[in-house]
Amino acid sequence: MDSFKFIQKKILLLGSGELGKELVVEAKRLGLEVIAIDKYENAPAMQLADHSFVINMNDKKTLINTIKKIEPDFVVPEIEALSIEALKELEEEGINIVPNARTVEITMNRHKIRDLASKELNIKTANFSYVFNAEELEMKSSEIGFPLLLKPLMSSSGKGQSLVKRKEDLLLAWEDALKNSRGKIEGVILEEFLNFDYEFTLLTVRKSSGENVFCEPIGHEQYKGDYQCSWQPLDMNESLINEARNMTNKILNNLNGSGIYGVEFFVRGKEVIFSELSPRPHDTGMVTLVSQNLNEFELHLRAFLNLPIPKISLLKPSATRVILSEKESINPSYTGLNEALEVENTKVLIFGKPTSKKGRRMGVVLSSDDDLNIARKNADKSASKIKIVS
């Protein structure tokens, strides 16, 4: 690729959170121009981008007009709260959507990705059923059985998800799901509650050649569907890893767009069960900032820019622990940073979000050690020192 033309590449980031911020860091290292968009001012990625705009990305006309005005070489969605119709129309006009508009549409909707995996590709998932009105709730929940998970068909970061243990709690969970739903679809998915042994993310890079390249599995823990900690590598049976890779190949060969994908699985005994997929850097994959020779943000850029991707190797066992806010505040400040940074082989990332609220992810601790257990303990210890204050 001609280096002068490459330097002139312009990337438009739709969504400007902490994952987008790290993508901007890597893009600027390659001399790229980055424009960041979000629904609020001073979002994390905006703080590093060349230019930024605040718009309603769910408004089709606004999103189309903004993208046409900017004239980017690549449009890179970092969130799911956006107009898919706008992306589809722009792609038809020749604008590069990463990885492609169809993939963004399928993966943002639990109905579409579950049907693709389970019904079309015959990939094992938890038992599930869709519900589009409250009258169907009791009947379909009895078919799944209690306890069950109730999730909006469109949401992210665990918003609107409930563990329902009895039918008396169904209506409340239904209302919470609809309140936290994104997009125009008013419906939920009921899922069998799996008594799984562990869950993991398989970061997978799809090259423009169609080759899929796998990172080492990343173990993670969630609370109400939201990531709390992760670690790499995950000690698991090679046959289970191969099964997850085979499932991932099936899905990505169907979606067929270049970039990095975070593919989530459950393991129950000798079963590997597909959970979800994100066509972008994954929150659990922030561990790769210290664990791998090429982190997930570098890999995403290299893939959709069609740049070389040499062998991905593990540098050292590593772990993360998120820093959560316990209160609401504007322009939050932090205590305990000195104590957190005293922990050996540990880094602290403060995302720079302009406001905090209870349970909001405000930062993450990264830790590495030859002993994975020590890395995990150090990440937990460091994160526990930091408190968000007004």
UniProtKB/Swiss-Prot annotation:
- The enzyme class is ligase
Protein's GO biological process: 'de novo' IMP biosynthetic process
Kindly give the SUPFAM superfamilies that the UniProt entry links to this protein.
Glutathione synthetase ATP-binding domain-like, PreATP-grasp domain, Rudiment single hybrid motif
Mention one GO molecular function: phosphoribosylglycinamide formyltransferase activity
Pfam families, from UniProt? ATP-grasp, PurT_C, RS_preATP-grasp-like
Where is the ATP-grasp domain positioned along the sequence?
115-305
The chemistry this enzyme catalyses reads:
N(1)-(5-phospho-beta-D-ribosyl)glycinamide + formate + ATP = N(2)-formyl-N(1)-(5-phospho-beta-D-ribosyl)glycinamide + ADP + phosphate + H(+)
Q: What are the EC numbers? A: 6.3.1.21
Instruction: Provide the residue positions that the database annotates as binding ATP.
Output: R110, K151, S156, S157, G158, K159, G160, Q161, E191, E192, F193, L194, E199
- Check the record and name the HAMAP family matching this protein: PurT
Q: Which family is this sequence assigned to?
A: Belongs to the PurK/PurT family.
Q: Which protein is depicted?
A: Formate-dependent phosphoribosylglycinamide formyltransferase
